[in-house]
Swiss-Prot record:
PROSITE patterns, per database record: KH_TYPE_2, RIBOSOMAL_S3
Purpose: Binds the lower part of the 30S subunit head. Binds mRNA in the 70S ribosome, positioning it for translation.
UniProt family annotation: Belongs to the universal ribosomal protein uS3 family.
InterPro entries according to UniProt: KH_dom (IPR004087), KH_dom-like_a/b (IPR015946), KH_dom_type_2 (IPR004044), KH_sf_prok-type (IPR009019), Ribosomal_S3_C_sf (IPR036419), Ribosomal_uS3_bac-typ (IPR005704), Ribosomal_uS3_C (IPR001351), Ribosomal_uS3_CS (IPR018280)
GO-annotated molecular function: mRNA binding; rRNA binding; structural constituent of ribosome
Protein's recorded name: Small ribosomal subunit protein uS3
UniProt keywords, alphabetically: Ribonucleoprotein, Ribosomal protein, RNA-binding, rRNA-binding
GO biological process: translation
GO CC list: cytosolic small ribosomal subunit
Repeat listed as a keyword: no
Compositional bias annotation for Low complexity: 249-263
Quaternary context: Part of the 30S ribosomal subunit. Forms a tight complex with proteins S10 and S14.
Compositionally skewed regions (Basic and acidic residues) per UniProt: 239-248
Length: 263
């Protein structure tokens, strides 16, 4: 199953968080919001192509929307003195409506070489610039493994090098276990627009396995109220103390009943 489906979609809710996080009131609103989210992502990826955007997360309420943009080069998105933010806000308002409050956060990707979206985009750009395919793929594999990845798989398909018959070319380095759900697999698909047709680029990156507490931390960030943990520990300590007192009372009572009567 892991070989057939989108590796990101298979892990949503397990070790990946959803990229659109909201709850709609009606089915009609659900459909409208899905279309709006797709329009927002298409606009950002197209306008800021050179910023190498990794992913765009969207959080909504009925009256507001917050967009998180993760990019390798956030300075290109922000512009001089954050002038581009106003342009982005106006564009998103046109999509979702003027009555919706819009917030935009631009975040820098810590290690771009471990983002499948960025690696696939760089490889597609190299193909568009007429870089030899084998050289571009080997450079991408070497860069990702050097960044600390456990494994990488790259699949390029189409009229490679302009040949008449389309074919596939795949490189695999390291361990890429697509069926193991605890494995943090990042997947992305990009396209290289050539004069003789479109070449598809697929990238899978194994960023290691997630165990124990980290396995659940990847799902969502849970914010606890102040003092909740201390109160929880205090309640547990009181419960254990009451339990020990009851046990001691029961033991003393049974011990007294078992003592032989004095003559």
């Amino acid at each position: 199953m892991g070989q057939k489906v989108n590796s990101n979609g298979l892990r949503f809710g397990i070790n990946k968080n959803w990229q659109s996080r909201w709850v709609a009131k009606t089915n009609q609103q659900t459909g409208d919001w899905i279309v709006q989210d797709e329009k927002i992502r298409n606009y950002l990826f197209k306008k800021f192509h050179s910023a190498f955007i990794s992913n765009v997360d969207i959080e909504r309420t009925q009256t507001s929307i917050r967009v998180f943009i993760y990019a390798s080069q956030p300075g290109i998105i922000l512009g001089k003195e954050a002038a581009n933010i106003k342009v982005i806000l106006l564009a998103i308002n046109k999509i979702v409506g003027r009555h919706i409050k819009v917030d935009v956060d631009v975040l820098e990707v810590g290690n771009p070489s471990l983002s499948a979206k960025i690696v696939a985009r760089e490889l597609a750009d190299a193909i568009e610039n007429r870089t030899p395919l084998r050289t571009a793929m080997r450079q991408a594999l070497k860069r990702v493994l050097k960044a600390g990845a456990k494994g990488i798989k790259v699949l390029v398909s189409g009229r490679l090098n302009g040949v008449e018959i389309a074919r596939d070319k795949m490189y695999i380095e390291g361990n890429v276990t697509l069926s193991t759900l605890r494995t943090d697999i990042d997947y992305a698909l990009e396209e290289a627009q050539m004069s003789y047709g479109v070449i598809g680029v697929k990238v899978w990156i194994n960023r290691g396995e997630i165990f124990g507490k980290d396995f659940y931390k990847k799902q969502a960030h849970i914010v606890k109220p102040k003092g909740s943990e201390a109160n929880h520990q205090r309640r547990n300590s009181n419960k254990s103390k009451d339990y020990r007192d009851n046990k001691n009372k029961q033991f003393n009572k049974n011990h007294q009943n078992q003592q032989p009567a004095k003559e």
